[in-house]
Amino acid sequence: MHHQSSRAEALVLQTLYESGSLALEHMTERIPELSWSEVFHAIDRLSRKGDIVLRRRGFSYHLSLPTLSHV
């Protein structure tokens, strides 16, 4: 279980490094090898640790790396 969660977190971070800010629904599209639940839980863990920033914009949520969160 820990290995899978670490892999999911690594894939989320890699996707953000490549894409910059990204809507939550697009993150799930960019990592088709993970279930929606795996992506969501990885985002939750990374956000709680401060490794990513999760912000609500209108009716959706956007993800970014902390250094890009001011954009």
Predicted features by range, described:
Residues 3-5, 54-71:
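Short, cationic-aromatic polyanion-contact patches
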Residues 28, 41, 58-59:
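Proline- and acidic/polar-enriched loop/turn elements at helix boundaries
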Residues 12-15, 37-39, 64-71:
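Phospho-regulated, low-complexity intrinsically disordered regions of nuclear gene-regulatory
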Residues 34-45:
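Short amphipathic alpha-helical interaction segments
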Residues 50:
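Glycine-centered, phosphate/nucleic-acid-interacting loop/turn motifs that mediate DNA/RNA or nucleotide
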Residues 2, 32-33:
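A generic secondary-structure micro-motif detector
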